């Protein structure tokens, strides 16, 4: 497995796009054709819990990999990676889908130091792009009235050393305030929208999530950071 923050995966995707741009017109057409054929295969694979939806999809992916994808995975140094993991910030679903198309499943995870690193993780059968997966064992979750994710469980830390005031600020009735605004799906998967402190509130009282705009901008190979 390979674990990286969103910026690592974004830079790898951009390095492929830059490399393709420097190839011959014929090679670019081959790449574009393979990506077009590979996208629905990856989408069906995601909808099927991470498994190929049919033998036809498996065979077609093998052909596309032979023609194009294997060389791209080798270029990135991930040809032997069975699964990747992405966490630490929000990430565009298009970035994750890019690697699924290449044949490297990238699973989103969520957590923080105060929750012992990981509290949510995608896994086969729970692979919705843009979601951080269901909870790990014995951890509970709920949201506050303003949408902040709250966690409770044996893996949650007890408090900050020698700082009772800081500890009191992040706990409420044994629930840890993560500082992240989320949507929780019926399946239990968490969709992290943004940091609570980064949410913009308009004069009309509407909440705007900057990360959605930032991730859309970063899908462009011409924009490094937004």
Indicate where each model-derived feature is located.
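Conserved ATP-binding/catalytic segment of the ANL
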Residues: 135-202
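C-terminal boundary motif of the adenylate-forming
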Residues: 181, 186, 220-226
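Amphipathic alpha-helical transducer elements in NTP-driven molecular machines
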Residues: 6-9, 27, 31, 178, ...
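Glycine-rich phosphate/pyrophosphate-binding beta-alpha loops
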Residues: 88, 157, 210
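Gly/Ser/Thr-rich phosphate-binding loop
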Residues: 1-3, 12-127, 140, 223-224
